[in-house]
């Protein structure tokens, strides 16, 4: 169903801006109050541990000599432009799709800002079970994951118009 699109979908970009602001504020606080590599226990399964990631998710390509920073920044920018265009063409009634796109855009641009400013992304959220630690991540990464999840759920729940 395509109704009330374009201009009416643009306010969802303000939600992306909110995600960017929360991400950048959390990274500022992490850099201000945490020490690199020294975990601070928050809950039995959660630490805040400052980490600088020059790669992508799970530090993919993080040990390369620097080309990956430009590569991942470019991908973040291009994907964000594509998603903004998609958002502008999405029906205002498709709330789950709009929310998912907004979260992904905000997360991608939050990490894009880090790559441009510092040549790395600040990660600090460290989930663990005893001595097993999941990859350290940040608010932008969380927004991207939740956004992708919402898009998948939306696509699974929305009937296809094709026979």
Curated annotation (Swiss-Prot):
PROSITE patterns: SPASE_II (PS00855). Its EC number is 3.4.23.36. GO terms for molecular function: aspartic-type endopeptidase activity; endopeptidase activity. InterPro entries: Peptidase_A8. GO terms for cellular component: plasma membrane. The chain crosses the membrane at residues 9-29, 42-62, 67-87, 93-113, 137-157. It is a multi-pass membrane protein. Keywords: Aspartyl protease, Cell inner membrane, Cell membrane, Hydrolase, Membrane, Protease, Transmembrane, Transmembrane helix. It is an enzyme of class 3 (hydrolase). Pfam families: Peptidase_A8. It catalyses: Release of signal peptides from bacterial membrane prolipoproteins. Hydrolyzes -Xaa-Yaa-Zaa-|-(S,diacylglyceryl)Cys-, in which Xaa is hydrophobic (preferably Leu), and Yaa (Ala or Ser) and Zaa (Gly or Ala) have small, neutral side chains. The active site is at 123, 141. Pathway: Protein modification; lipoprotein biosynthesis (signal peptide cleavage). GO terms for biological process: proteolysis. It is found in: Cell inner membrane. Belongs to the peptidase A8 family. This protein specifically catalyzes the removal of signal peptides from prolipoproteins. This is Lipoprotein signal peptidase. It comes from Coxiella burnetii (strain RSA 493 / Nine Mile phase I). The gene is lspA.
């Amino acid at each position: 169903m395509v109704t009330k699109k374009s201009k009416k979908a643009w306010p969802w970009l303000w939600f992306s801006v909110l995600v960017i602001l929360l991400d950048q504020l959390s990274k500022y606080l992490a850099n201000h109050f945490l020490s690199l590599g020294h975990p601070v226990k928050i809950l039995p399964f959660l630490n805040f541990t400052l980490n600088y990631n020059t790669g992508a998710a799970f530090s993919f390509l993080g040990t390369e000599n620097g080309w990956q920073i430009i590569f991942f920044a470019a991908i973040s920018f291009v994907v964000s432009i594509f998603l903004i265009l998609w958002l502008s063409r999405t029906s205002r009634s498709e709330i789950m799709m709009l929310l998912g796109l907004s979260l992904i855009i905000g997360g991608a641009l939050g990490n894009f800002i880090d790559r441009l400013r510092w040549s790395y992304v600040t990660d600090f959220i460290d989930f663990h079970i005893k001595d097993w630690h999941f990859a350290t991540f940040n608010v932008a990464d969380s927004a991207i994951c939740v956004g992708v999840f919402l898009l998948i759920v939306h696509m699974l729940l929305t009937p296809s118009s094709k026979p």
